[in-house]
Amino acid sequence: MKISKKDALIWFEFFSMLPEDEEPMTKQQEIIYATFAQIEAAIDHRNDMLMSEINNLKTLSNRTFYVGSDIKFPNGCRSCLMGTGLSAIRKTNKCNIECKFCYNYGELDFIPPIGEGMWQIGETKFYEKDIDLLLSIHKKPTGISYVYLEPFMEIEKYYSVVKKFSDAKIHQHLYTNGILATEESLKALGEAGLDEIRFNLGASKCSDKVIENIKIAKKYIKKVGIETPMTPEFFEAFFNKKQAILDTELDFINCAELHLNENNIDNYYGENMYISRHGYISPTWSRELTLKFMKIADEENWDLAVHDCSNHTKFARDLNLSSKEGKWFGASSYGCEFSKIPYEVFLPILRDENFKFLIEEELPSGYRPGELVF
């Protein structure tokens, strides 16, 4: 059904007032999903229009979009989308800052430790001495990534593990906000064999210190880039310091479409939201800004790759992972981050007079307010 925006608003105002333990009836679920489809179709149409304006837009086997240098496109992303997946390794349970877009916002003091001397790989805990056993039994991944909070809180613990995976010839990339990085620690990571480092430049609001650390990292690590959620704050801060950032000669910029969970969604209260394939909930402006960013990069011929790490990309990522794991046709772990749909977060976009559905039809008989039997 092509529900009208007016009818969708009436229903979602009702849904947002329901007690948390009250489940919608089948016909109400149809209305909910019809509304999500209408919003998503309008967002997809806008994105298609923006992409049509990027002259040299490229794809990686239709799994993601990027502009710029093919050689500088991050191999960590190739592994994630074409290889064995992200293959996350976790160690640190602390961070030196708190970002409003962080998935752990508000709970940073309550993150459980991995364990003294231990590393979490594939949801299993290992001592460093166990890694040789792991490599001798399991098929080697195409790449691994050091994720979760801030590794430079205890970066000295990482060097020997990085060296071990480097000796095994496995591609490795690491995420950091870059604030605590030093020339000494970046050099040590490079000497240990880290292939790629990604700075969340948005976390520091594009601070001069982190920009300088990006430049230093280029001296020691093969591939250096930025990966940060695309927000209006990052977009503005980046272009205020664009030349200084590009002068670091970084290799890539991954613009992640911001998606929200129960920890951080209140930080974006009142923003226009959409839900992608009944999964990730995102502000509508995040990918819009990414595509505008990519258009500028393409027109100005920046000597790097700019990658659109969108909800579409993450959907493709999870399909690739399930196929590599030998799961059934269509299997994927992609899904919603919320245990219950937060209907109220869709009220702003339904109330926005400037946001239009592409096609609207009258509700069928039996679906109009007052016609459903409770």
Predicted segments with their positions:
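Flexible, acidic/Gly-rich N-terminal and inter-domain linker regions that tether
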Residues: 1-88, 97, 363, 373-374
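Accessory C-terminal segments flanking Radical SAM cores
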Residues: 2-12, 305-374
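Mobile, glycine- and charge-enriched loop segments
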Residues: 52-56, 83-86, 100-109, 117, ...
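Conserved alpha-helical substructure of the radical SAM core
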Residues: 65-66, 73-90, 94, 100-101, ...
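Core AdoMet radical
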Residues: 106-126, 137-154, 166-181, 189-209, ...
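Distinct, well-ordered alpha-helical segments
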Residues: 155-162, 182-190, 209-213, 238-241, ...
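Structural recognition of alpha->loop->beta junctions
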Residues: 186-202, 242-255, 327-350
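Conserved C-terminal portion of the radical SAM core fold
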Residues: 211-317, 332-341
